[in-house]
Amino acid sequence: MKICVIIPTLNEEKNIEKIFIKIKKTKIKLDILFIDDNSKDKSQKIIIKLSKEFKNVDYIFR
């Protein structure tokens, strides 16, 4: 069974990597789905970078 953590974001560039690191430190294998609601900061760029580096990270941009 896979577990997916869904993380809604809106202008969270300062927090995305922090929460990602905390989730990654768990011993549970998780998929991570960021759902961004048209952030005006660099949130989407950070999310794209993470998704390229880690195969368990995906995103939806609205």
Which residue ranges define each predicted feature?
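Short, Lys/Arg-enriched, disordered terminal segments
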Residues: 1-2, 25, 52-53
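A short, compositionally biased N-terminal segment around positions ~18-40 that is enriched
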Residues: 28-34
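Short, well-formed alpha-helical segments that are part of the catalytic scaffolds
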Residues: 12-26, 46
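Conserved donor nucleotide-binding strand/loop of the catalytic core
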Residues: 30, 44-62
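Onset of an N-terminal alpha helix
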Residues: 10-13, 40
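A conserved acidic beta->alpha catalytic loop
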Residues: 36-44
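Conserved sequence signature across two-component system core domains
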Residues: 9, 35-37, 62
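Cell-envelope/extracellular polymer assembly enzymes that use nucleotide-activated donors
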Residues: 2-4, 31
